[in-house]
Amino acid sequence: MLVYQDLLTGDELLSDSFPYKEIHNGMLWEVEGKWVIQGAVNVDIGANPSAEGGEEDEGVDDQAVKVVDIVDTFRLQEQPAFDKKQFVTFMKRYIKNLTPKLDAEKQELFKKHIEGATKFLLSKLSDLQFFVGESMHDDGCLVFAYYKDGATDPTFLYFAYGLKEIKC
């Protein structure tokens, strides 16, 4: 199994259990999330109250919760939305922090293509939800989620060059 960690913080953000598609010259990974029901365990203990003349089984009140699989699995923490100025400030700081961590070849590609990916994200800014890894570190990678037209499940966007592949 492969796990993808934030290159700057070490937070686990994704695994190969969630297939991705590269977009914007490989700068972003697009991953489909799914809403899932967590909790609501149906336990059959073998009792049959109706056959024994007892009352109808009322069960247990176990709180079923609807969560997004990626957010739940990697304990992503939702952040308040950014306005354009905040987002541009974040991107400048992120590029400054990430670039030295990349090898020379990746630095060239990153510098060449990150502007296009940033413009793409800016065009969707009002539709994006923002997440960070479990440590909630300020300098960490942001993970973005949005809903494509007509979709009921969110699509997540990751900065590909901000992820480090770890074999488990």
UniProtKB/Swiss-Prot annotation:
UniProt-annotated location(s): Cytoplasm
Gene Ontology MF annotations: calcium ion binding
Residues annotated as domain TCTP: 1-168
InterPro entries hit by this protein: Mss4-like_sf, Mss4/transl-control_tumour, TCTP, Translation_control_tumour_CS, Translational_control_tumour_p
Pfam family, any one: TCTP
Gene Ontology cellular-component terms listed: cytoplasm
Alphabetic keyword roster: Calcium, Cytoplasm
SUPFAM superfamilies: Mss4-like
Organism superkingdom: Eukaryota
Similarity remark: Belongs to the TCTP family.
Annotated function: Involved in calcium binding and microtubule stabilization.
Name listed for the protein in its UniProt record: Translationally-controlled tumor protein homolog
Natural source organism: Elaeis guineensis var. tenera (Oil palm)
